[in-house]
Amino acid sequence: MEDFVRQCFNPMIVELAEKAMKEYGEDLKIETNKFAAICTHLEVCFMYSDFHFINEQGESIIVELDDPNALLKHRFEIIEGRDRTMAWTVVNSICNTTGAEKPKFLPDLYDYKENRFIEIGVTRREVHIYYLEKANKIKSEKTHIHIFSFTGEEMATKADYTLDEESRARIKTRLFTIRQEMASRGLWDSFVSPREAKKQLKKDLKSQEQCAGSPTKVSRRTSPALRILEPMWMDSNRTATLRASFLKCPKK
């Protein structure tokens, strides 16, 4: 699973996931499923934000190409992917600026158009079950919840899906692709079932040949979301690497 993750996700996403697991004292060599889940969640958060801006009139627009002459503001503030101290600093700044109620738990995004924090969920189970778990944990009507599944289902607070259908379809397609790629490598069952995960871990410890030697294909599309995070967690020497867009899983 670890090899699969490193080949199928952008290196910057992988690095963020590694830092997150290290921050919480988790070993990615053992918790490989969690490693994959964190990378998936990070990518969904970045895709959620990608290409969405607010123009001078305060309208939400989608721009896929950078226009240096356009006076645009990013619609979403990305909180996920930052270390806890910096994340809370961003949240406090947003609350002080917008008057938003400070959430009890760290959310994933802030939507400047709708003026609300957003909690993104990616589940391997039924969306309504995971939604209820999130809602019971957060216990706040102020934080908007949006859940995606690997089967193309989604659920959001008051059926308000925030994004346009095309943007959501892009996320669903990516999740479905990840599922298919995992299944083709015999990793999906262990990703879904803890019991199967233990069996897979034993296999992984015996052999690290899974996905080894496969060529990695790089899409040339730039991820604006990753660019937003650059000042917060990247140094200038790695800007070129940052600008590399999301990696696609190599075909068998």
From Swiss-Prot:
Site (Important for efficient shutoff activity and nuclear localization): 195, 198-199
GO-annotated biological processes: viral RNA genome replication; viral translational frameshifting
GO molecular function: RNA binding
Catalytic residue list: 80, 108
Superkingdom to which the source organism belongs: Viruses
Keyword terms: Decay of host mRNAs by virus, Eukaryotic host gene expression shutoff by virus, Host cytoplasm, Host gene expression shutoff by virus, Host mRNA suppression by virus, Host nucleus, Host-virus interaction
Entries under InterPro entries matching the protein: PA/PA-X (IPR001009), PA/PA-X_sf (IPR038372)
Localization (cell): Host cytoplasm; Host nucleus
Site features described as Important for efficient shutoff activity, chain residue numbers: 28, 65, 202-203, 206
Coiled-coil zones: none
Residue intervals passing through the bilayer: none
Functional summary from the UniProt entry: Plays a major role in the shutoff of the host protein expression by cleaving mRNAs probably via an endonuclease activity. This host shutoff allows the virus to escape from the host antiviral response. Hijacks host RNA splicing machinery to selectively target host RNAs containing introns for destruction. This may explain the preferential degradation of RNAs that have undergone co- or post-transcriptional processing.
Domain notes: The probable endonuclease active site in the N-terminus and the basic amino acid cluster in the C-terminus are important for the shutoff activity. The C-terminus acts as a nuclear localization signal. The C-terminus is recruited to host protein complexes involved in nuclear Pol II RNA processing.
Similarity comment: Belongs to the influenza viruses PA-X family.
Protein name per its UniProtKB record: Protein PA-X
Organism of derivation: Influenza A virus (strain A/Brazil/11/1978 H1N1)
